[in-house]
Amino acid sequence: MQVGRNCHFCPYVLIDLIYPDRVKIGDNVTIGSNSMIFAHSNPTANLFLKKEQYPRTIAKVNIKSGAVLNPGCIITAGVTIGENSIISVGSVVTQDIPDYCVVVGNPGRVIKKISHNEV
Protein backbone atom coordinates (compact mmCIF):
# COMPACT_ATOMS: atom_id res chain seq x y z
CA MET A 1 0.00 0.00 0.00
CA GLN A 2 1.22 3.47 -0.84
CA VAL A 3 -0.01 6.33 1.33
CA GLY A 4 0.78 9.97 0.60
CA ARG A 5 1.55 12.74 3.06
CA ASN A 6 -0.91 14.38 5.44
CA CYS A 7 -3.59 11.67 5.16
CA HIS A 8 -6.19 11.14 7.88
CA PHE A 9 -7.68 7.70 8.59
CA CYS A 10 -10.58 7.56 11.05
CA PRO A 11 -11.16 4.45 13.21
CA TYR A 12 -12.14 1.10 11.70
CA VAL A 13 -11.00 1.77 8.13
CA LEU A 14 -10.41 -1.52 6.29
CA ILE A 15 -7.96 -1.65 3.41
CA ASP A 16 -7.75 -4.89 1.44
CA LEU A 17 -5.97 -7.44 3.62
CA ILE A 18 -5.07 -9.79 0.78
CA TYR A 19 -3.78 -7.32 -1.83
CA PRO A 20 -2.86 -4.12 0.06
CA ASP A 21 -0.03 -3.51 -2.42
CA ARG A 22 -2.66 -2.72 -5.08
CA VAL A 23 -3.98 0.31 -3.15
CA LYS A 24 -2.52 3.78 -3.72
CA ILE A 25 -3.65 6.78 -1.67
CA GLY A 26 -2.49 10.28 -2.61
CA ASP A 27 -1.63 13.26 -0.40
CA ASN A 28 -4.19 14.99 1.86
CA VAL A 29 -6.78 12.21 1.65
CA THR A 30 -9.35 11.73 4.43
CA ILE A 31 -11.05 8.37 4.94
CA GLY A 32 -14.01 8.22 7.33
CA SER A 33 -14.80 5.58 9.94
CA ASN A 34 -15.96 2.15 8.81
CA SER A 35 -14.96 2.74 5.19
CA MET A 36 -13.65 -0.20 3.15
CA ILE A 37 -11.31 -0.30 0.17
CA PHE A 38 -11.06 -3.56 -1.78
CA ALA A 39 -8.51 -4.42 -4.48
CA HIS A 40 -10.19 -7.77 -5.11
CA SER A 41 -13.60 -9.40 -5.24
CA ASN A 42 -14.23 -13.06 -4.79
CA PRO A 43 -17.80 -13.93 -5.83
CA THR A 44 -16.91 -17.63 -5.97
CA ALA A 45 -16.61 -17.78 -2.21
CA ASN A 46 -20.19 -18.98 -2.60
CA LEU A 47 -19.86 -22.70 -3.29
CA PHE A 48 -23.00 -22.73 -5.43
CA LEU A 49 -21.59 -20.34 -8.06
CA LYS A 50 -19.51 -21.66 -10.93
CA LYS A 51 -16.03 -20.12 -10.90
CA GLU A 52 -15.90 -19.78 -14.69
CA GLN A 53 -19.03 -17.61 -14.73
CA TYR A 54 -17.95 -15.37 -11.85
CA PRO A 55 -14.17 -14.93 -12.01
CA ARG A 56 -12.16 -13.41 -9.20
CA THR A 57 -11.25 -9.75 -9.80
CA ILE A 58 -7.91 -8.31 -8.70
CA ALA A 59 -7.29 -4.69 -9.71
CA LYS A 60 -5.57 -1.55 -8.47
CA VAL A 61 -7.40 1.14 -6.52
CA ASN A 62 -6.17 4.72 -6.80
CA ILE A 63 -7.47 7.44 -4.49
CA LYS A 64 -6.05 10.71 -5.76
CA SER A 65 -4.87 13.67 -3.69
CA GLY A 66 -7.42 15.68 -1.73
CA ALA A 67 -10.21 13.10 -1.97
CA VAL A 68 -12.59 12.73 0.97
CA LEU A 69 -14.30 9.42 1.67
CA ASN A 70 -16.98 10.00 4.28
CA PRO A 71 -17.89 7.30 6.84
CA GLY A 72 -19.13 3.93 5.61
CA CYS A 73 -17.94 4.18 2.00
CA ILE A 74 -17.06 1.07 0.03
CA ILE A 75 -14.57 1.35 -2.83
CA THR A 76 -14.40 -1.71 -5.10
CA ALA A 77 -11.51 -3.19 -7.08
CA GLY A 78 -10.25 -1.30 -10.10
CA VAL A 79 -11.69 2.09 -9.13
CA THR A 80 -9.95 5.47 -9.30
CA ILE A 81 -11.31 8.28 -7.13
CA GLY A 82 -10.53 11.64 -8.72
CA GLU A 83 -8.57 14.47 -7.20
CA ASN A 84 -10.52 16.49 -4.60
CA SER A 85 -13.66 14.39 -5.11
CA ILE A 86 -16.05 13.84 -2.21
CA ILE A 87 -17.68 10.46 -1.62
CA SER A 88 -20.80 10.83 0.55
CA VAL A 89 -21.67 8.74 3.60
CA GLY A 90 -22.35 5.07 2.83
CA SER A 91 -21.72 5.33 -0.91
CA VAL A 92 -20.59 2.24 -2.83
CA VAL A 93 -18.23 3.20 -5.65
CA THR A 94 -18.03 0.63 -8.45
CA GLN A 95 -16.63 2.76 -11.27
CA ASP A 96 -14.08 5.53 -11.77
CA ILE A 97 -14.93 8.99 -10.44
CA PRO A 98 -13.55 12.06 -12.24
CA ASP A 99 -11.69 14.87 -10.46
CA TYR A 100 -13.73 17.44 -8.49
CA CYS A 101 -16.99 15.49 -8.18
CA VAL A 102 -19.50 14.76 -5.42
CA VAL A 103 -20.72 11.14 -5.32
CA VAL A 104 -23.74 9.69 -3.50
CA GLY A 105 -25.61 6.41 -3.32
CA ASN A 106 -25.39 2.71 -3.99
CA PRO A 107 -24.14 2.37 -6.62
CA GLY A 108 -22.32 5.67 -6.31
CA ARG A 109 -23.18 8.27 -8.93
CA VAL A 110 -21.88 11.76 -9.57
CA ILE A 111 -24.45 14.38 -8.59
CA LYS A 112 -22.31 17.48 -8.81
CA LYS A 113 -19.11 18.79 -10.32
CA ILE A 114 -17.20 21.01 -7.87
CA SER A 115 -16.03 24.28 -9.40
CA HIS A 116 -12.54 25.50 -8.56
CA ASN A 117 -14.14 28.53 -6.86
CA GLU A 118 -15.71 26.20 -4.26
CA VAL A 119 -12.44 24.48 -3.34
Regions found by a protein language model. Name each.
Residues 1-7:
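Extended, small-residue-rich solenoid/repeat segments and analogous flexible loops
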Residues 42, 80, 91-92, 98:
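Flexible glycine-rich beta->alpha loop in the catalytic core of nucleotide-sugar glycosyltransferases
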Residues 87, 105:
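Conserved G/P- and acidic residue-centered "switch" motifs that form tight phosphate/ATP-binding loops
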Residues 95, 112:
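Short helix N-cap motif at coil->helix boundaries in the Bergerat
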Residues 9-80, 106-107, 113-115:
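Flexible, glycine/small-residue-enriched loop-and-beta-strand segment within the central core
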